[in-house]
Amino acid sequence: MNTTHVPEPHRTEQHAENQRHWRKILGIAPIVSIAFPATMYFISDEDSFEDSLFLRFITVLLPFSYSAVQYALLHTNWKSHNKPERILQSILYYTLNLLFLAFSIISILSIIAFTLAEWEDDDWENNNDPIIFSFILPSFTVPLTYLLSTSCCLVPGQIGFTDTGINVLVDILILLCSAGDLVPAFDEVKHCYYFAIISSILILIRLLREKLSPEKQSPPPTAPWRIAVFVLILISIVIAYALLAYLIMNADIFDNYYSSLFDKMKNIFSSKPDE
């Protein structure tokens, strides 16, 4: 009996090739996710974001889609490849499982909430929602997601920061830029694009080093400082997504819509028929 059989090495090579293509796409995604919203801000008029629902949607789509996909992948991989055997492992397993799922959901809700919310463009120096959604939030959340996805090992017993050499310095600078990105939000928002530019350049440098330099075996991330860096990255992400959740809950998405609808209904019922 003749049967068609695909050799296992061929399947393995095809799977590895697909993974390489997927890594290339995800590799440039953080840069595009930061640069595209910034570009939309510069090429649009001052009142365009307030008037156009579609413009708001495409501005927030890429950064939060990137985060949603990355955390969904982390959640799937962590859930399928790790089985807790001890109490501490169970706590870590369910904590990270819940966090990755929450981060992915918050990213999706951010797309919806920030698209439907009205973006006020009051003052370049003070409250400027287009700058917040185009610069501050993408350059705050995307680099942190990138660091967790590429620079950390999520294997039980080996959880920690894995980068070596100059990449350690680059990653620390990326982390500092993400933290510094919040400063303009409380001071002068016009300075925030500096952090977006620097973050994109640092990520580009890291990607070029990965492409040009031969891959080296990462050391086991069991050193205390590597675990500390991983914890710092994770805490920063928790703070970032707690802030996003707060912004979503205070976005007042439908307030203006329902207020306008209520006023129209009130006028209809309060109006008297012509005599």
From Swiss-Prot:
Pfam families per UniProt: DUF2463 (PF09591)
Top-rank taxon, per record: Eukaryota
| Sequence similarity | Belongs to the UPF0328 family.
Tell me the protein's name.
UPF0328 protein ECU05_0050
Instruction: List the source organism.
Output: Encephalitozoon cuniculi (strain GB-M1) (Microsporidian parasite)
